[in-house]
Amino acid sequence: MRKVMLAEKAGFCFGVKRAVDMALLTQKEYNKKIYTLGELIHNNDVVDKLKDNNVYPIGIEDIDNLKENDVILIRSHGISEEIYKILLSKGLTVINATCPFVTKIQEKVKKYNELGYDIVIVGDKYHPEVIGINGWCDNKAIISKQGENLENITSESKVCIVSQTTEKLENWEKVLKEVKNRAIEVISFNTICNATSERQKIAKDLSNKVDFMVVIGGKQSSNTTKLYEICKSNCNETIHVENSGEIPENILKNKNCVIGVTAGASTPDWIIEEAISKMSENQISNETNNEMADAMKFIAENEGKIYVGASVTGEIIQVSEKEVFLNINYKRDGVIPKSEIDDDGKDLKELFTVGDKIVAKIIKLKDADNYVVLSVKELQREQGYKEIKEAFENKTTLNVVVKEDVKGGIIASYKGIRIFIPASHVELFHVDNLKEYIGKSFDVAIIEYSTKKRQTKIVASRRALLSKEKEKVEETVWNKLEEGQVVEGEVKRLTDFGAFVEIEGVDGLLHVSEISWGRVEKPADVLKIGDKIKVYVLSVDKENKKLSLSVKKLTENPWNNVEEKYPVGSVVLGKVIRFADFGAFVKLEPGVDGLVHISEISHKRIAKPSDALNVGEEIKAKILEVSSEEKKIGLSIREVEE
């Protein structure tokens, strides 16, 4: 039984399809004969179909015969800079259908040629694409197919190397290796089109599995010829045909074989389908997908659906470093620049895959390269405004990312929409450095959403959410706090009258008098912000949200049994800790101080305590009196002096 297997990625590539669509569109717009500089693509059947639609190829020698305002279309292979300037100087209407990937190569060689680099092009020197590229570097490029013509490159050469988009990868690697062996400074751009390399790999794999391999495409088509060479190296029974009429009888009569089919980038679907149908012994249906008819049908059916602001669904047909190209079922393909997709610098080839469907918003009907310009960001923004308004009306939250700090607050982003957050709404406390929040994401509540003179003002608050969260936490903590509990807290603030200690989000006051049994002048003398300390809960006032704490309650009152510890008449050692006009205070133990009256300091008459004593001095004194109720101990230094 005969089996026909069609390779994936066979047929029209992105650049070729774009050129054909542009030719048909241009003819429709101008409604007169349109000229293409050279055959638009290397496929005789397509060229004939274009002629049927009043699109005719001419040679460079025919340019002088054109009249002002005649319309000429540059084919997908591109042309030299010199010829491009000639077309413009003649007053012609020039439509540039150069494949965008070829245009980028032209830009690269022009740039590096002007920077003094030797340009090397890997490819066929007679191919129109290579001729055109060479024309953008003053026709000075070294053209090498398999490593030849590189004799003038030396170790002192600065080289920029690019490739014909349809070149075989093995040729690129061979020439690149040779260039790097000769020159030290080499800038290389592998400009082989992804579609080309994928098509070649798939064709190579398929040719290993079949009895016959049929490669369909124009005999002048470079990429088709390379497909033939690749397949022929694996399958000896490989043939190159332009259409179904060239398929030989030995294949058609073989009833028991597997036939592989691939096609060059210039081969439309309807030619491929004719060939498959013939080899499969099926009649061609009247509903055969005709590439030309489809293109014209899309022009008619979708004209009214494409306008700035409309949302469209497209199928990804190509992904480059800077753009994503879509088939949007319209006379022009769509393009999404990277700037309209993502701000985070991600690789587009990691985000998108050829064949995926994507929805985007139209922001321009036609750019310089004749694409419909689309934006994912604008679609997200449109949806974002709806979600922000709903969040404002329903009092729900949104997660935003902080982008920059501005006067009076910060700017956050939600789906590309700027949202202002006042500085006073960032935290529950004052923030000195708002730059610390750049790049951070958090939930916010929308507190203002208004539109005036076509401008939308959006203000959000994080503090409102933090306040609600704090209230919930505090409510739980207040319900479990009781007098007499011992809990752990963190010192958050210090004042002259005490320290504020946070316990699971609730602030309590540790009064200066409750820090120690001894005298504390200032809380900062014994505590610092951030200290983790255990505290005793003195009182809990849930209604007024007041919490009183104590540290000294965690230790025994040193005045208990003081009469037994310090009997009257005993002599003790102590340290002078401070002076008063009437005497000196002496520390006997933590929390217990005694007073030496000025009259009990010395046998000599002194005007003030500091005349005889120094703060920090160790002294010996006699206990004159003790009162635990009044917390007083009277001392005398004079009575122990000899």
Curated annotation (Swiss-Prot):
Pathway: Isoprenoid biosynthesis; dimethylallyl diphosphate biosynthesis; dimethylallyl diphosphate from (2E)-4-hydroxy-3-methylbutenyl diphosphate: step 1/1; Isoprenoid biosynthesis; isopentenyl diphosphate biosynthesis via DXP pathway; isopentenyl diphosphate from 1-deoxy-D-xylulose 5-phosphate: step 6/6
Catalytic activity: isopentenyl diphosphate + 2 oxidized [2Fe-2S]-[ferredoxin] + H2O = (2E)-4-hydroxy-3-methylbut-2-enyl diphosphate + 2 reduced [2Fe-2S]-[ferredoxin] + 2 H(+); dimethylallyl diphosphate + 2 oxidized [2Fe-2S]-[ferredoxin] + H2O = (2E)-4-hydroxy-3-methylbut-2-enyl diphosphate + 2 reduced [2Fe-2S]-[ferredoxin] + 2 H(+)
Cofactor names: [4Fe-4S] cluster
SUPFAM superfamilies found in the cross-reference section: Nucleic acid-binding proteins
Keyword annotations from UniProtKB, A to Z: 4Fe-4S, Iron, Iron-sulfur, Isoprene biosynthesis, Metal-binding, Oxidoreductase
Metal-binding recorded as keyword: yes
EC number: 1.17.7.4
GO biological process, any: isopentenyl diphosphate biosynthetic process, methylerythritol 4-phosphate pathway
Protein family: In the N-terminal section; belongs to the IspH family.
Name listed for the protein in its UniProt record: 4-hydroxy-3-methylbut-2-enyl diphosphate reductase
Organism: Clostridium acetobutylicum (strain ATCC 824 / DSM 792 / JCM 1419 / IAM 19013 / LMG 5710 / NBRC 13948 / NRRL B-527 / VKM B-1787 / 2291 / W)
